Amino acid sequence: MSWQAYVDEHLMCEIEGHHLAAAAIVGHDGAAWAQSTAFPEFKTEDMANIMKDFDEPGHLAPTGLFLGPTKYMVIQGEPGAVIRGKKGSGGITVKKTGQALVVGIYDEPMTPGQCNMVVERLGDYLLEQGM
């Protein structure tokens, strides 16, 4: 299965009538492996800061998590494994695997829990596959 198929079929899938606003799978080096059409353009620096927060939990708390032009307030995640962010009625979930970051962005009516479930389910699967 191609990385794009993982994004299209597993991240952008419908959950209780809703789906993510955007999603991507990005390498630890910041290079996008696959992404949905609405995924924002981001800087390598954005991904470097996210990676640093996985290594040093709390790194993003003072400044927020930036993905392109959007700033998310970092909320409780799982140190070293999952970062969650909130902006208004939407937010972001980032799951770290051995080689990649699985990123999901949501807006209402999708809930944070639905976003977490979609992103973390694929991330856990990739971890099981050694990815």
Swiss-Prot record:
Modified positions (Phosphothreonine) in chain numbering: T111
GO biological process: nuclear migration; regulation of actin cytoskeleton organization
Pfam families per the UniProt record, alphabetical: Profilin
Entry keywords, A to Z: Actin-binding, Allergen, Cytoplasm, Cytoskeleton, Disulfide bond, Phosphoprotein
Tissue: Pollen specific.
PTM text: Phosphorylated by MAP kinases.
GO MF: actin monomer binding; proline-rich region binding
Subcellular location, record wording: Cytoplasm, Cytoskeleton
Family as reported in the entry's similarity comment: Belongs to the profilin family.
Self-association and partners: Occurs in many kinds of cells as a complex with monomeric actin in a 1:1 ratio.
Protein name from the UniProt record: Profilin-2
